[in-house]
Amino acid sequence: MKLIIFTGLVLFGIVSLIEAQAENEKACLPQYQVCTDAPGNCCSNLVCDCYGRYKSGARIGRNCFCLQKGVIYKRED
């Protein structure tokens, strides 16, 4: 009986370790990819920058993209 419990605990530990490792190896989002629903998934040299969308002064949405850290984007007319 103790052997069965011990085996179960060992298997549970192995499965938990595999799941944690798979979680850490998730593919990151490359530059210019949308990160609205996953702000923490941009690659390490990128940051998830969000911008509000407005129409006639009213906010109609929000867009987020993986962009380079420290870079400022300006609108060109």
Curated annotation (Swiss-Prot):
| Keywords carried by this UniProt record | Disulfide bond, Secreted, Signal, Toxin
Subcellular localization, per the record?
Secreted
Q: Which Pfam families match?
A: Toxin_35
Q: Which domain of life is it from?
A: Eukaryota
The region annotated as signal peptide is 1-20
Q: Name one GO molecular function term.
A: toxin activity
Tissues and organs where the protein is expressed, per its UniProt entry = Expressed by the venom gland.
A cellular component term from Gene Ontology for this protein is: extracellular region
- Is Ion transport one of the keywords? no
Identify the propeptide residues: 21-26
Processing and modification events after translation: Contains 4 disulfide bonds.
Family label: Belongs to the neurotoxin 19 (CSTX) family. 08 (U8-Lctx) subfamily.
This one is known as: U8-lycotoxin-Ls1v
